[in-house]
UniProtKB/Swiss-Prot annotation:
Pathway: Cofactor biosynthesis; NAD(+) biosynthesis; NAD(+) from deamido-NAD(+) (ammonia route): step 1/1. Deamido-NAD(+) binds at residues 147, 180, 187, 267-268. This is NH(3)-dependent NAD(+) synthetase. ATP binds at residues 50-57, 167, 196, 218. The lineage of its organism: Bacteria, Pseudomonadati, Pseudomonadota, Gammaproteobacteria, Pseudomonadales. InterPro entries: NAD/GMP_synthase, NAD_synthase, NH(3)-dep_NAD(+)_synth, Rossmann-like_a/b/a_fold. It is an enzyme of class 6 (ligase). It comes from the Bacteria. GO terms for cellular component: cytoplasm. Transmembrane segments: none annotated. It comes from Pseudomonas savastanoi pv. phaseolicola (strain 1448A / Race 6). Its EC number is 6.3.1.5. Belongs to the NAD synthetase family. The gene is nadE.
Length: 275
């Protein structure tokens, strides 16, 4: 393992590869316990998570639903619940997969909040967009969509006195592939430290359909590049990112891209700067 790989892995608290099925099951149990502890320590009984249709929110949702089921069983308190929230922007191209994901999770409640009108209303009021290239406006509004989705989730959590779950994991964190104060905002991040193939392995452990487990990851935030794969944005594959984080050799160009991207996105992984 290169020294830089070791340093980054330590900073992101990357978990080692699952040695076998027992190790995977133990990790699932540990993360479910973590969710339960967070909820009980906050003296709250509701978990809220936006479900996009991707494997990350699918896996986080499965962990959350198991956590509240176990809390109901162990405490006899049936008020513990998990709320899955669909947050489409107008019409989502892969809505069928998103609904299939929610169906498989079987949350206690499901809500749908369309963020389209809110994002468009805000965009209409921003004079700074005047004269900007369409691509620049599209990029900014992509981040606005992510932030509006988090506003919606925290609004639901506030109404039901709950905690918001995030889906960030090590393979996204190392690339800074999240919107600051958007999908990067949450109260607890149960996938933290996992690489992408471990997230998929946990989804499989729950019996999730391969069509959802292996669905091409996409943030799908930009109107001019609908459904753009994450890997096209990264310039490297998730397999290469996973290998890098686990200290395995990767091609020279991938190593360079990951290290440079990690350095320039450091501000996204830190608290606001202060004097």
């Amino acid at each position: 393992m290169h020294a830089v790989q070791r340093q980054i892995a330590e900073q992101l608290k990357v978990q080692p590869p699952f040695a076998d099925q027992n190790a995977l099951q133990a990790e699932v149990a540990r993360r479910v316990s973590f969710i339960k502890e967070c909820l009980q320590n906050a003296r709250l009984k509701t978990l809220v998570l936006g479900i996009s249709g991707g494997v990350d929110s699918l896996t986080a949702g499965l962990l959350a639903q198991r956590a509240v089921k176990e809390l109901r069983a162990s405490t006899g308190d049936n008020s513990y619940r998990f709320i899955a929230v669909r947050l489409p922007y107008v019409v989502q191209a892969d809505e069928h997969e998103a609904q299939a994901s929610v169906d498989f999770i079987e949350p206690d409640e499901r809500h749908t909040i369309n963020i389209g009108s809110s994002v468009k209303a805000l965009a209409a009021e921003v004079k700074a967009f005047d004269g900007l290239p369409a691509s620049s406006v599209d990029f900014v509004l992509g981040n606005t969509k992510a932030r509006m989705r988090m506003v919606a989730q925290y609004t639901v959590a506030g109404a039901y006195q709950g905690l918001v779950i995030g889906t960030d994991h090590a393979a996204e964190a190392v690339m800074g592939f999240f919107t600051k104060f958007g999908d990067g905002a949450c109260d607890l991040a149960p996938l933290s430290g996992l690489v992408k193939n471990q997230v998929r392995a946990i989804a499989r452990h729950f019996g999730a359909p391969e069509s959802l487990v292996e669905k091409v990851p996409t943030a799908d935030l930009e109107d001019l590049s609908p459904g753009k794969p994450d890997e096209a944005s990264h310039g490297v594959t998730y397999a290469e990112i996973d290998a890098f984080l686990h200290g395995e050799p990767v091609r020279e160009e991938a190593f360079k891209i990951i290290c440079e991207t990690y350095a320039k996105t450091q501000h996204k992984r830190e608290l606001p700067y202060a004097p």
